């Protein structure tokens, strides 16, 4: 997750492969400080543009596509019909390939599932942290500082900074090259900057344009291939459910204990507030990752643009906890339906509410059919069986995206409701579930990192300007609470 942990063996695509007669290749690429890292000492006049970029993970994915182009025919595949797809950080990486001139001709369709559309800050990556310890991107200089401290060369990061500033460029380069994998990962994950987002690509001007994905969309310099963008209705519940400020947790019992889980959710502390902040967090994510890029691409003539929203949330109640409200159509849940991996004790025990299993299987089959038809033809249409509701292209004037849900709820249908910033701000300003201060805190939290929120100017003028002078220390503490928990999980996986 987050371009920090994971490997190519996580997914089991056997159901997708067998049901749709496709070949699925899962690729391995460098992550964390090995995949995306910059330090001024690592480049010189002899460095290639690729080495200067810091986008080593992205270059790995490009190399993988070159290998596929050269070799997939030996596995029964077609090198002239390659579809790339990925979720979350993987969706971000698919977007990077879609926007990178170096990936031209290596793939022919793209599916971005819950991607992140913002990019890393080169300035932050190549400078020391400011005094408030806040930065949108991990700093290569600070990682070197933390290794100096961990080796006992410096007493603390301030002393390390003094030492590093006295080191020659070659000494810094040799020191970084001497660092072990464990040292680099530990330095990255320990005491990360406030406001840091997911590990993302650098807009270096070679692998990725200097203006990032937004420039590629607006200038229409993307790779001219059909694309699907999508998010899940309750993306943020995946993260908010782990936050003790929103959900009360206790030692596991019953099914949770049987599944080997130490802690279990007991109750949502304020359900209406929980639902409200999820709607806006997930809504602004949809705006930045789906609706805005789709609208801009279509405006610039990229007609083969499709979009979806995954809405399935018919989960069960476990030990008195309503998972359909706690988790809902959360981040990453659609992967289960794309891959069709339902034959698992934990999945069967935890996910499905009364009567929801067979409709969920049907939805999974339909999603696989759409994904495969898109891979075959560049248009998901009515699926490979030509029997599903028509998935139309994104239209700036009419219907825009396909809602993916089971027959127990909405089913599969097109929607014309676009999530613009104006639409979301209007909803937020009139939401009776939140006080004005809570509305300000919600918008601040959404805009704090990863580029899904609003500009400083828009924030300062929201609700007549009452938000700009409030104290958001508690909001930042709440954000950091879930970030700390997820970072600990990343360290354990690593």
Name each model-derived stretch.
Residues 109, 117, 121-127, 158-361, ...:
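Substrate-gating cap/lid region and adjacent catalytic-acid/histidine neighborhood
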Residues 59-66, 92, 134, 138-142, ...:
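A structural signal for well-ordered alpha-helical segments within the folded catalytic domains
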């Amino acid at each position: 997750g987050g371009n920090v942990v994971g490997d190519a063996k996580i997914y089991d695509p056997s159901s997708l492969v067998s049901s749709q007669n496709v070949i699925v290749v899962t690729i391995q690429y460098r992550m964390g400080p090995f995949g995306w890292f910059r330090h001024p000492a690592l480049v010189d006049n002899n460095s290639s543009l690729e080495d200067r970029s810091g986008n080593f993970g992205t270059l790995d994915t490009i190399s993988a596509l070159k290998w596929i182009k050269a070799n997939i025919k030996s596995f029964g595949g077609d090198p002239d019909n390659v579809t790339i797809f990925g979720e979350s950080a993987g969706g971000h990486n698919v977007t990077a390939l879609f926007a990178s001139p170096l990936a031209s001709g290596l793939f022919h369709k793209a599916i971005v599932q819950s991607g992140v559309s913002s990019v890393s800050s080169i300035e932050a990556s190549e400078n020391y942290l400011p005094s408030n310890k806040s930065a949108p991107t991990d700093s290569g200089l600070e990682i070197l500082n933390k290794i100096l401290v961990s080796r006992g060369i410096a007493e603390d990061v301030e002393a390390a900074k003094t030492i590093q500033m006295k080191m020659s460029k070659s000494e810094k380069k040799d020191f970084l090259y001497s660092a072990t994998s464990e040292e680099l990962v530990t330095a990255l994950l320990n005491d990360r900057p406030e406001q840091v987002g997911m590990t993302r690509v650098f807009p270096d001007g070679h692998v990725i344009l200097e203006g990032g994905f937004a420039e590629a969309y607006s200038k229409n310099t993307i790779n001219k291939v059909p694309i699907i963008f999508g998010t899940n209705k309750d993306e943020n519940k995946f993260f908010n459910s782990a936050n003790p400020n929103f959900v009360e947790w206790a030692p596991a019992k019953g099914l949770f204990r049987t599944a080997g889980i130490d802690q279990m959710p007991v109750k949502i502390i304020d359900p209406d507030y929980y639902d409200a902040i999820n709607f806006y967090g997930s809504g602004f994510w949809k705006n930045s990752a789906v609706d805005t890029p789709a609208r801009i691409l279509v405006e610039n003539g990229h007609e083969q643009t499709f979009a979806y929203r995954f809405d399935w949330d018919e989960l069960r109640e476990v030990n008195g906890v309503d998972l359909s409200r706690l988790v809902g159509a959360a981040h990453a849940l659609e992967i289960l339906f794309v891959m069709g991996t339902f034959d698992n004790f934990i999945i069967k025990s935890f996910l499905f509410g009364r009567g929801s299993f067979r409709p969920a299987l049907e939805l999974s089959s339909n999603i696989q059919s759409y994904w495969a038809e898109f891979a075959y033809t560049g248009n998901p249409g009515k699926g490979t069986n030509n029997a599903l509701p028509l998935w139309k292209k994104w239209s700036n004037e009419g219907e825009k995206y396909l809602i993916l849900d089971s027959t127990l709820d909405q089913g599969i249908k097109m929607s014309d409701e676009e999530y613009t910033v104006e639409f979301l701000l209007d909803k937020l300003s009139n939401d009776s579930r939140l006080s004005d201060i809570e509305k300000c805190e919600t918008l601040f939290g959404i805009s704090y990192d990863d580029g899904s929120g609003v500009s400083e100017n828009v924030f300062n003028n929201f609700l007549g300007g009452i938000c700009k002078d409030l104290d958001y220390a508690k909001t930042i503490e709440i954000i950091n609470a879930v970030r700390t928990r997820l970072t600990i999980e990343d360290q354990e996986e690593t």
